[in-house]
Amino acid sequence: MTKKEIAEEIYDRLIRDYNVKIQKKEVYNLVSEVFTIIQECLLKGEKVKISGFGTFVVKTRKPKKGMNIKKREIVEVPERKIVLFKPSKNFIKS
């Protein structure tokens, strides 16, 4: 599901379930802003916990040795940061 599809689903539910009068573009902008805030927090090294959904956290992967298949030589894979997601217990149950 893309960001656009998420915004469209939220838009449809707002109109159907809550009779909210809002434009699709406004919903898309809100969804974009939510993702921007999550990204900014993760880039600062902060944990993002969404109750009932899960937690996003940035971890550092240690450098390791890898293989360049084309050249058949061992290469050093540098340290890098990755985003991990741990679903909440409620998320797993549903």
Swiss-Prot record:
Name one matching Pfam family: Bac_DNA_binding
Q: How is this protein annotated for GO cellular component?
A: cytosol
Single biological process term from Gene Ontology: chromosome condensation
Q: Cross-referenced Gene3D superfamilies, in alphabetical order?
A: IHF-like DNA-binding proteins (4.10.520.10)
* Stored InterPro entries: Hist_DNA-bd (IPR000119), IHF-like_DNA-bd_dom_sf (IPR010992)
Query: GO molecular function: any one?
Result: structural constituent of chromatin
What keywords are annotated for this sequence in UniProt? Answer: DNA condensation, DNA-binding
Q: What does this protein do?
A: Histone-like DNA-binding protein which is capable of wrapping DNA to stabilize it, and thus to prevent its denaturation under extreme environmental conditions.
What's the family? Belongs to the bacterial histone-like protein family.
Q: What is this protein called?
A: DNA-binding protein HU
Source organism phylogeny: Bacteria, Pseudomonadati, Aquificota, Aquificia, Aquificales
